[in-house]
Amino acid sequence: MSKIKGLIFDMDGTLVPNMPYHSRAFEEQARRHGYKLRRPVDGRFFGWHKDDVIRAVLDSEICEKYGVEFLADEKEEIYRELYRPDADLTPGLRPLIQEAKSLGIGCAIGSAGPRENVEFIVEATNSAELMDVTISGNDVQHCKPN
């Protein structure tokens, strides 16, 4: 039997129970700018790159007016504002990760999300000492499922 050397935790919806906050951030952004989402932001978009989600849920006119990069970055800022007061690891994960670390098992975050969100989660959940490595969507050429 081979020894487990490491655990990689997906961040959004696994390491932290934050998915409703992403949906709320899209809704809040639309409210602030006075437009409607083309379709609801639901599970089908989880794991997508932020720019791809913007293109999927907003009309092309909105994307052209504001710019996809601006909209994506702004949405992530709103998400962090909304989630900060409630940010915490999924119940039971902190002791599991602490046990893994005590056994010499490395732990990492792997996320399609932007680096700013990964850093935010590590800071807001006080989990820097738990993670040996963090990988974000900024660190890879192609996001999931590649």
Over which residues does each language-model region extend?
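Substrate-recognition "cap/lid" segment bordering the active-site pocket of phosphatases
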Residues: A108, P114-N146
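N-terminal helical cap/lid subdomain that shapes the substrate entry/recognition surface
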Residues: S2-M11, L15-R94, Q98-L103, E116
